[in-house]
Amino acid sequence: DENNQEIVGTTSNCRSVNVCRQVAYNNAITTYASLAASYVKGRTASDVNLNSSDKDDTAEFDKFYAAYERVIGSEIKNGVLKESYSIKRKKGDINEYQIVFFVNEDKALLARKKAMQRALEESQLAQKYANEISKFVNEGVENINQ
């Protein structure tokens, strides 16, 4: 499907396949959340014209980025990731595991919007920069995981 992106979760050095699967799943979520937050941080820095000498704004943006990354990680657990396939490799009595997920971009966009709203509410930025940040979150993201 052209509206899906691929994201990979990996882990190694685990003995239980169930533990491997869970760690790989969590790693995929962490990777996606980190990439989404990096995208927002980059766009914010360039589009909002953040003045790095304004320590109050910088601190609030740091809180916002952390909250956004945390919330997007919890939001994408709700049906955004769909497992495509997994690969297990055994090395002695430990396993390496990799799961490839499809990220449904329609659902991911809704998750990012919800995460953005919650992160803005947690920071003081809602009144000052909400329109600019909302604009590029609503634009969607092409190839966020590349």
Give the location of each predicted region.
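Domain-level marker for long, solvent-exposed, non-transmembrane regions
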Residues: 1-146
